[in-house]
Structure formats: C-alpha cells, structure tokens
Amino acid sequence: ILWETSGHLDHYSENMYPPINHDENNETYYLKPMNCPFHILVYKSDLHSYKELPLRYFEFGSVYRYEKTGVLHGLLRLRGFTQDDAHIFCSTDQINDEVKTLLSFSVKLLGSYGLTEIEADLSTKPNKYIGSDNDWDNATNSLKQSLTELKVPFQTAEGEGAFYGPKIDLHAKDAIGRRWQLSTIQIDFAQPDNFDIEYVNSDNKKSRPVMIHRALLGSVERFTAVLLEHYAGNLPGWLSPIQIDVLTIGNVNDYAQTIIDDLKSYRVNLDDRNIRLGEKLHNSEKSKTPIQIIIGEKDASSNTMAVNIFGKENMKDVDYKKAINSIKKLSLIHISEPTRQIVI
C-alpha cells in the first residue's frame, strides 16, 4: 500500500480518514492526506541523470485530513483543502541554491498580495531523526543562510523539526498585527529512502536525491481567509472577484452595454433588475465590490455617470470618458499601494 511505503499509516494515521473497502474488487482505498507520494511515483516512472536535477513537480492538489471537530475553523482549518504543492528532487550540493530560490519566491509572492511583514521559524534536528548528522547540518545551514541573505527575520525552534528533515515556516502579519503561518519549505531525507528513488551521478553510479517539499500559499483556502482578514473583506481592485458593478435605473441597457464594452478587460457585473437602487447598492456593498457605476436615463442622454469608489467620496455627473479612463487606472493599481486612489 502506498501509504505504508510512505510511512503515513505508521506516523500520520490519526490524521487520515479510515480506509474505504471496496468489496467488489477486494481493494482498500484511502483519501490522500498529502500529495508527495504521487510526485515520487512520477519521479520513479523514469530513469534520471544528474543533468536533469533539480527536477521540480508542481500541482494544485486536493488533500483530506481528519481534523478534530474542535480545531476546525472556517476556511482557516478544514478537513479538505487544496495545496499549491511542489516537490523538488535535487542533489545535496544543490540544496542551498534551491532553498534560496524558494524562499525568495515565497517572500515575493506574499508581498505581491500585500503581506509584507514576514517572519520565519527555523525548525531544527529533533532527538529522533533519520539521515546523517552531516546531512542535517548542511541542510539546516542552507536554510539559515538563505534566511540571513534574504534578510528574513527568524527564530530557531531547536529540536522541533520533523524526524525526516529541517524546515522553514513563514509567518505573515496582517493589518492589525496578527501572525499567520503560510509558506513551508521542508527538506526530506526519509521519502527518497522509503521509495528507493535514485539518479545516475556524474561517475555513472546511482545516488540518492534529496527531496524538498514546498507550499507557498499553505493552502488556497487558508490563504484566501488570511487575505480576507488582512483587508477586512475589501480586497484590492485587481484581486476582487467582481471589480465593477454597473447599476441601472430605468431602461438604459444600451448605455450600460457601451460602458461594459469599454471595460471588457475587467470583471464587470451588470445589475439591471427591476428593483430599487438602494437594494442594488446594498447588494454590491455587501459583496465588497470596490467600484459601482450608477446610470439612469439622464446619464444616458448627457453621456455621464455616477461613480462610487471604496474609500472615496461618491461622485455624480462625471464625464463618461474621464470616468472610464480613471477607472482603468484604478484597476491597475498594485496591491502594495496603501489605498485605492482615483482622480476624476
């Protein structure tokens, strides 16, 4: 069984769902708690040379873990979630460069979403471990050196690493100072042995690669929850599922369609229902849409519109061209900007 080979049934079974027995073909199935064994099977499906390393596999993979009811918490702690999961197979002398690349990627990725206050925990060798002391020391030093070179503040969690390798956990502080664990970079000396994976080295002999696990978002669901907490639900314009709501008063659908066509590069929703404007505005604000364009018959005849922008004073009778051009600038403002700004 795959999960016996990986060691999950021995070391992780309390977090796995019970087996599903299929009587018809006499087979036993498990909901996968992790993606790594499957990436290893992909690696094992072919012979590999040192010239191919580092070899990197990535997927958005769904996993299922039997978390206790008391720790479940919205999107932050789930029993089923999707990880941005990658596994890197490399030689021991490539660990340093790979870790530095991964750490730099993680910090830049989180920063691009506005999470710029990053701290790290470096978990080191526990009392019980596999692999040589030399491998552990080199791997731990690679993690530490990368954190130092990239100027990521970190604290060392002595003896708190997994038995199969040291790791880095990145934590981001949100707008009100709460600390959230997100990215993980984990070095693994165990799974290459468990699955007996190899590559042919420069001396034409078989060698054991090192495996690096990495999930930069942690999970898509948890990362989404952290962003919603960080921005209090008011996501930046570029990240909002709907960027602009066009709200109509009366029969102005042709004018509304002209606006939508001019904003076709953006995520625009048309609300032309025959209900009160106040209800339309309430629904749009409840959905946290950052921009509302309001048009009636007077606007259609005068080529104007009313524009509401999150965090700004509402504006009426704005010239069509001026409003459209300014909205386009707004939608392109980068997440790292402290506020959304528009000049009309």
Label every model-predicted segment.
Residues 1-332, 336, 340:
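NTP/phosphate- and nucleic-acid-binding module
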